[in-house]
UniProtKB/Swiss-Prot annotation:
GO terms for cellular component: cytosol. It comes from Caldivirga maquilingensis (strain ATCC 700844 / DSM 13496 / JCM 10307 / IC-167). Belongs to the prokaryotic AdoMetDC family. Type 1 subfamily. Its EC number is 4.1.1.19. Gene3D superfamilies: S-adenosylmethionine decarboxylase. Binds 1 pyruvoyl group covalently per subunit. It is an enzyme of class 4 (lyase). This is Arginine decarboxylase proenzyme. Pfam families: AdoMet_dc (PF02675). Is synthesized initially as an inactive proenzyme. Formation of the active enzyme involves a self-maturation process in which the active site pyruvoyl group is generated from an internal serine residue via an autocatalytic post-translational modification. Two non-identical subunits are generated from the proenzyme in this reaction, and the pyruvate is formed at the N-terminus of the alpha chain, which is derived from the carboxyl end of the proenzyme. The lineage of its organism: Archaea, Thermoproteota, Thermoprotei, Thermoproteales, Thermoproteaceae.
Length: 134
């Protein structure tokens, strides 16, 4: 039978015993649609968020999806520690944000908070999950 365990957040001090995984993700509503369509702005936002969170950037890719007023942008930053992703739906003033890191030295919540501050949504969610192996 599958057992659910309570998990302290953030979980520190596990480095030598196993994988330290920290996952921060959520959604934003009420963001300026022009920001959510601006792939260069979003790319630079993710780069700066990685820096703020003490992550080591490997590469950033940007994709535009759809067309017209319903087209969105996806930005994925590969960082040595894992990834940062933003997916936008400008027609709905909506986006999702995902920051996942492995290791004890990075601070994914700082990256998430930086992105939120820069996007300035009317409302947002923030979920922090400990994804450590022990």
């Amino acid at each position: 039978m599958l057992q659910q365990q309570e998990s302290p957040i953030p979980r520190l001090g596990v480095g030598e015993e196993g994988v330290v995984g920290r996952h921060v993700f959520g959604e934003v509503w009420g963001v300026n649609d022009k920001l959510l369509q601006d792939d260069e702005y979003l790319k630079n936002l993710v780069i700066k968020a990685a820096e703020v969170a003490n992550m080591h950037l490997v590469d950033v890719k940007v994709w535009r999806f759809g067309g017209g007023d319903k087209g969105g942008v996806s930005v994925i930053a590969l960082v040595l520690e894992s990834h940062i992703a933003i997916h936008t739906w400008p027609a709905y003033n909506y986006a999702t944000i995902d920051v996942y890191t492995c290791g004890e030295h990075s601070r994914p919540w700082d990256a998430y908070d930086y992105i939120i501050k820069q996007l300035n949504p009317k409302t947002f969610t923030k979920t922090i999950v400990d994804r450590s192996s022990k």
